[in-house]
Protein backbone atom coordinates (compact mmCIF):
# COMPACT_ATOMS: atom_id res chain seq x y z
CA UNK A 1 0.00 0.00 0.00
CA UNK A 2 2.38 2.65 -1.30
CA UNK A 3 1.91 5.98 0.36
CA UNK A 4 -0.99 4.99 2.57
CA UNK A 5 -1.34 7.77 5.10
CA UNK A 6 1.73 9.59 3.73
CA UNK A 7 1.97 12.46 1.30
CA UNK A 8 3.98 11.67 -1.78
CA UNK A 9 5.69 14.05 -4.14
CA UNK A 10 6.27 13.63 -7.83
CA UNK A 11 8.28 16.83 -8.06
CA UNK A 12 11.54 16.26 -9.87
CA UNK A 13 14.51 18.16 -8.52
CA UNK A 14 17.94 18.87 -9.87
CA UNK A 15 21.01 17.63 -8.10
CA UNK A 16 22.75 20.29 -5.98
CA UNK A 17 25.16 22.53 -7.85
CA UNK A 18 28.00 21.29 -5.63
CA UNK A 19 28.17 17.78 -4.18
CA UNK A 20 29.91 19.02 -1.03
CA UNK A 21 31.84 21.92 0.53
CA UNK A 22 35.12 20.76 -1.02
CA UNK A 23 33.63 20.98 -4.52
CA UNK A 24 32.23 24.45 -3.77
CA UNK A 25 35.59 25.59 -2.39
CA UNK A 26 37.40 24.28 -5.48
CA UNK A 27 34.96 26.23 -7.69
CA UNK A 28 35.47 29.42 -5.65
CA UNK A 29 39.26 29.05 -5.77
CA UNK A 30 39.27 28.44 -9.52
CA UNK A 31 37.11 31.48 -10.21
CA UNK A 32 38.95 33.75 -7.77
CA UNK A 33 42.07 33.26 -9.89
CA UNK A 34 40.39 35.09 -12.79
CA UNK A 35 40.89 38.68 -11.67
CA UNK A 36 41.75 42.02 -13.19
CA UNK A 37 44.33 44.22 -11.46
CA UNK A 38 43.02 47.40 -9.87
CA UNK A 39 44.51 50.75 -8.95
CA UNK A 40 43.43 54.16 -7.76
CA UNK A 41 42.35 56.90 -10.15
CA UNK A 42 43.78 59.52 -7.78
CA UNK A 43 47.31 58.18 -8.35
CA UNK A 44 46.97 57.26 -12.03
CA UNK A 45 49.12 59.00 -14.62
CA UNK A 46 49.55 58.94 -18.37
CA UNK A 47 47.02 57.58 -20.84
CA UNK A 48 43.79 56.09 -19.53
CA UNK A 49 41.18 54.18 -21.48
CA UNK A 50 37.48 54.45 -20.77
CA UNK A 51 34.79 51.90 -21.53
CA UNK A 52 31.06 52.55 -21.19
CA UNK A 53 28.28 49.98 -21.46
CA UNK A 54 25.09 51.95 -22.00
CA UNK A 55 22.53 49.23 -21.36
CA UNK A 56 18.77 49.45 -21.60
CA UNK A 57 18.34 49.67 -17.82
CA UNK A 58 21.83 50.28 -16.39
CA UNK A 59 25.07 52.01 -17.26
CA UNK A 60 28.47 50.53 -16.49
CA UNK A 61 31.82 52.26 -16.80
CA UNK A 62 35.47 51.39 -16.26
CA UNK A 63 38.59 53.49 -16.65
CA UNK A 64 41.76 51.47 -17.18
CA UNK A 65 45.48 52.15 -17.35
CA UNK A 66 47.57 51.21 -20.38
CA UNK A 67 48.59 48.00 -18.60
CA UNK A 68 44.96 47.01 -17.97
CA UNK A 69 44.43 47.94 -14.30
CA UNK A 70 40.94 49.23 -13.46
CA UNK A 71 41.27 52.59 -11.69
CA UNK A 72 37.62 53.65 -11.70
CA UNK A 73 34.34 51.79 -11.99
CA UNK A 74 30.71 52.82 -11.96
CA UNK A 75 27.47 50.82 -12.07
CA UNK A 76 24.02 52.38 -11.79
CA UNK A 77 20.54 52.44 -13.20
CA UNK A 78 20.17 54.83 -16.11
CA UNK A 79 16.62 55.97 -15.42
CA UNK A 80 15.73 55.34 -19.05
CA UNK A 81 18.18 58.01 -20.24
CA UNK A 82 21.61 56.57 -21.12
CA UNK A 83 22.95 59.95 -22.28
CA UNK A 84 22.09 61.68 -19.00
CA UNK A 85 23.58 58.76 -17.06
CA UNK A 86 26.76 58.89 -19.16
CA UNK A 87 27.07 62.65 -18.62
CA UNK A 88 26.96 62.06 -14.86
CA UNK A 89 29.85 59.62 -15.14
CA UNK A 90 31.79 62.05 -17.36
CA UNK A 91 31.50 64.69 -14.64
CA UNK A 92 32.51 62.22 -11.92
CA UNK A 93 35.61 61.04 -13.82
CA UNK A 94 36.70 64.51 -14.95
CA UNK A 95 36.53 65.82 -11.39
CA UNK A 96 38.63 62.90 -10.11
CA UNK A 97 41.16 62.81 -12.97
CA UNK A 98 44.68 63.73 -11.80
CA UNK A 99 46.53 66.49 -13.67
CA UNK A 100 49.12 64.08 -15.09
CA UNK A 101 46.54 61.59 -16.42
CA UNK A 102 44.44 61.92 -19.54
CA UNK A 103 41.72 60.01 -21.33
CA UNK A 104 43.44 58.71 -24.45
CA UNK A 105 40.45 56.87 -25.88
CA UNK A 106 36.84 56.01 -25.06
CA UNK A 107 34.63 53.23 -26.37
CA UNK A 108 30.93 52.63 -25.80
CA UNK A 109 28.81 49.53 -26.26
CA UNK A 110 25.32 48.39 -25.39
CA UNK A 111 21.73 49.27 -26.15
CA UNK A 112 22.43 53.03 -25.98
CA UNK A 113 25.73 52.85 -27.88
CA UNK A 114 24.68 55.02 -30.81
CA UNK A 115 23.00 57.68 -28.66
CA UNK A 116 25.93 57.99 -26.26
CA UNK A 117 28.54 57.89 -29.02
CA UNK A 118 26.83 60.71 -30.91
CA UNK A 119 25.96 62.84 -27.88
CA UNK A 120 29.36 62.63 -26.20
CA UNK A 121 31.49 62.28 -29.35
CA UNK A 122 32.91 59.02 -28.05
CA UNK A 123 35.87 57.75 -30.11
CA UNK A 124 34.47 54.33 -30.90
CA UNK A 125 31.43 52.11 -30.61
CA UNK A 126 31.76 48.35 -30.30
CA UNK A 127 29.19 45.64 -30.90
CA UNK A 128 28.21 44.35 -27.47
CA UNK A 129 28.84 40.68 -28.21
CA UNK A 130 32.39 41.44 -29.35
CA UNK A 131 33.04 43.60 -26.29
CA UNK A 132 31.89 40.76 -24.02
CA UNK A 133 33.96 38.17 -25.86
CA UNK A 134 37.11 40.32 -25.80
CA UNK A 135 36.72 40.99 -22.07
CA UNK A 136 36.13 37.31 -21.31
CA UNK A 137 39.14 36.29 -23.41
CA UNK A 138 41.34 38.83 -21.60
CA UNK A 139 40.31 37.43 -18.21
CA UNK A 140 40.16 33.74 -19.12
CA UNK A 141 42.17 32.99 -22.28
CA UNK A 142 40.68 30.16 -24.30
CA UNK A 143 37.12 30.89 -23.17
CA UNK A 144 34.57 28.76 -25.02
CA UNK A 145 31.28 30.32 -23.86
CA UNK A 146 30.10 33.74 -22.73
CA UNK A 147 26.62 34.37 -21.29
CA UNK A 148 25.22 37.92 -21.24
CA UNK A 149 22.07 38.50 -19.22
CA UNK A 150 20.89 41.98 -20.14
CA UNK A 151 17.90 44.20 -19.66
CA UNK A 152 16.40 43.45 -23.09
CA UNK A 153 17.63 39.97 -23.91
CA UNK A 154 19.95 37.15 -22.94
CA UNK A 155 22.74 35.93 -25.21
CA UNK A 156 24.88 32.81 -25.17
CA UNK A 157 28.04 33.15 -27.25
CA UNK A 158 29.95 30.04 -28.32
CA UNK A 159 33.61 30.47 -29.21
CA UNK A 160 35.66 28.12 -31.35
CA UNK A 161 39.24 28.69 -32.44
CA UNK A 162 39.34 32.23 -31.06
CA UNK A 163 36.28 33.40 -33.01
CA UNK A 164 32.57 33.62 -32.29
CA UNK A 165 31.06 30.43 -33.66
CA UNK A 166 27.40 30.93 -32.76
CA UNK A 167 25.09 33.19 -30.80
CA UNK A 168 21.78 32.13 -29.25
CA UNK A 169 19.40 34.90 -28.16
CA UNK A 170 16.40 34.79 -25.85
CA UNK A 171 14.38 37.80 -26.94
CA UNK A 172 12.65 38.47 -23.62
CA UNK A 173 14.82 38.72 -20.54
CA UNK A 174 13.66 41.23 -18.00
What is the role of each PLM region?
Residues 52-84, 88-92, 167-174:
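Short glycine-rich, Thr/Ser-proximal phosphate-binding strand/loop in the N-terminal lobe
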Residues 90-104:
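Phosphate/pyrophosphate-binding loops at sites that engage ATP/ADP/AMP, CoA/4′-phosphopantetheine
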Residues 1, 73-78, 124-174:
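Glycine-rich phosphate-binding loop of actin/hexokinase-like ATP-binding domains
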Residues 1-51, 55:
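Flexible inter-domain linker/hinge segments
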Residues 118-122:
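Glycine-rich loop at the start of a catalytic domain that most often binds anionic cofactors/ligands
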Residues 1-2, 85-88, 92, 115, ...:
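Alpha-helical scaffold segments in soluble metabolic enzymes
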Residues 39-67, 71, 143-160:
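Gly/Thr-rich phosphate-binding beta-strand-loop-beta motif of the actin/hexokinase/Hsp70
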Residues 63-64, 110-113:
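Flexible hinge/switch segments at interdomain interfaces of large molecular machines
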Amino acid sequence: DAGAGQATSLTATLRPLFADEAERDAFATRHAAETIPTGDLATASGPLFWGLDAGSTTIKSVVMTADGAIVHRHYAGNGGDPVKAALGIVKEVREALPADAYLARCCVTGYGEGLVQAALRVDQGEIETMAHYRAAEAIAPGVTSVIDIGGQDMKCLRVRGGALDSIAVNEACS
